[in-house]
A protein has these predicted regions:
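Phosphate-binding loop of NTP-binding sites
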Residues: 5-148
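Phosphate-bearing ligand-interacting subdomains
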Residues: 1-3
Length: 148
């Protein structure tokens, strides 16, 4: 899967390198934080795209997503759309599932925000224990979010 994410990054021409990437992770507050960062960047004159729980936004466009952090092929396709639309920044929610499933492979974030960590998302469909969840969130500062 990691190789696939990096391959899709190359397939779409490395769109994340054409924008300032801001990644937001944490148990709670990702959506609110991404909206606030987007508003600040827009007020500063940037053309901003946003990817997360509420979908994809870029000037004049909005559409829904199935996942907070889309699968790697879909994510790279979205980033290409944002870059082609002239976005110079992208603010995105980065879920622990997105990290665990290598959906963000190939993306280097210039800015990383870690909101908080609570013992949520524990169960058969997500993380087997809080320790595992904490480990994946912690990986944000190493492999998945290497530019932090």
């Amino acid at each position: 899967p990691l190789r696939h994410g990096a391959a899709f990054h190359r397939l779409f021409g490395r769109p994340a390198l054409e924008m300032t990437m801001v990644g937001v992770t944490g148990t709670k507050g990702k959506t609110t934080t991404t909206h606030m960062i987007k508003a600040v960047l827009e007020a500063a004159g940037h053309k901003v795209g946003m990817v997360g729980t509420n979908g994809v936004y870029y000037p004049g466009h909005h559409y829904d997503l199935n996942n907070t952090t889309p699968e790697s092929y879909e994510l790279q396709k979205i980033l290409r759309q944002l870059a082609d639309a002239g976005c110079d920044a992208c603010v995105m929610e980065v879920s622990s599932q997105g990290i665990m499933m290598d959906r963000v492979a190939g993306i280097h974030y210039k800015v990383g925000v870690f909101t908080n960590l609570y013992p949520d998302h524990i169960g058969p469909g997500e993380h087997s224990s809080f320790e595992e969840y904490r480990s994946w969130k912690g990986s944000c500062s190493s492999a998945a979010m290497s530019a932090w």
